[in-house]
């Protein structure tokens, strides 16, 4: 038997956790995610958005939302840009581990839509210019994974 998630958003309930830090980037990721969800027939009333201060806070809120049982998928959006210190490495590693842990603990797909870039230019490229919009890509993954898990449960 093959299992495959369909890209049909009808009847899905999705939460998006988005960092306010680097909001000139994360705002564009959020727009891309919401637009893509709606284009795939997710009802706008079934999209909830939680804003957090920075990327480090994303896993905690994602876990709270996933544990509520109210959502078919959680999308995480943030932007961490390398600076002059090692802070970037710590934040990126811990956020990735945290999001992965939420997937394991809740069995709700939590999609990693957090940009980890070397420069502002790379972030801008991935937020809707040259390299597409990673928020939109995360939304497609959320729809597919939510439907895949539903098909396995059936």
Curated annotation (Swiss-Prot):
Catalyzes the formation of 6,7-dimethyl-8-ribityllumazine by condensation of 5-amino-6-(D-ribitylamino)uracil with 3,4-dihydroxy-2-butanone 4-phosphate. This is the penultimate step in the biosynthesis of riboflavin. (2S)-2-hydroxy-3-oxobutyl phosphate binds at residues 84-85, 126. It catalyses: (2S)-2-hydroxy-3-oxobutyl phosphate + 5-amino-6-(D-ribitylamino)uracil = 6,7-dimethyl-8-(1-D-ribityl)lumazine + phosphate + 2 H2O + H(+). Pfam families: DMRL_synthase (PF00885). The active site is at 87 (proton donor). It comes from the Bacteria. Keywords: Riboflavin biosynthesis, Transferase. This is 6,7-dimethyl-8-ribityllumazine synthase. The lineage of its organism: Bacteria, Bacillati, Bacillota, Bacilli, Bacillales. GO terms for cellular component: cytosol; riboflavin synthase complex. Forms an icosahedral capsid composed of 60 subunits, arranged as a dodecamer of pentamers. The gene is ribH. GO terms for biological process: riboflavin biosynthetic process. Belongs to the DMRL synthase family. Signal peptide: none annotated. Its EC number is 2.5.1.78.
């Amino acid at each position: 038997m093959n299992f495959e998630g369909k890209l049909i958003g009808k009847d899905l309930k999705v939460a998006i956790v988005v960092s306010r830090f680097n909001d000139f980037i994360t705002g564009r990721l959020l727009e891309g995610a919401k637009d893509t969800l709606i284009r795939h027939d997710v009802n706008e009333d079934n999209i909830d958005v939680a804003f957090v201060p920075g990327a480090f806070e994303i896993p905690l809120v994602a876990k709270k939302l996933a544990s509520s049982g109210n959502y078919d998928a959680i999308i995480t959006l943030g932007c961490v840009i390398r600076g002059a210190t090692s802070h970037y490495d710590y934040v990126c590693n811990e956020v990735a581990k945290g999001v992965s842990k939420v997937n394991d603990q809740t069995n709700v797909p939590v999609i990693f839509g957090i940009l980890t870039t070397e420069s502002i230019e790379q972030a801008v490229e991935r937020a809707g210019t040259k390299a597409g919009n990673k928020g939109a890509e995360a939304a497609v993954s959320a729809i597919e994974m939510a439907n895949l898990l539903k098909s396995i449960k059936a």
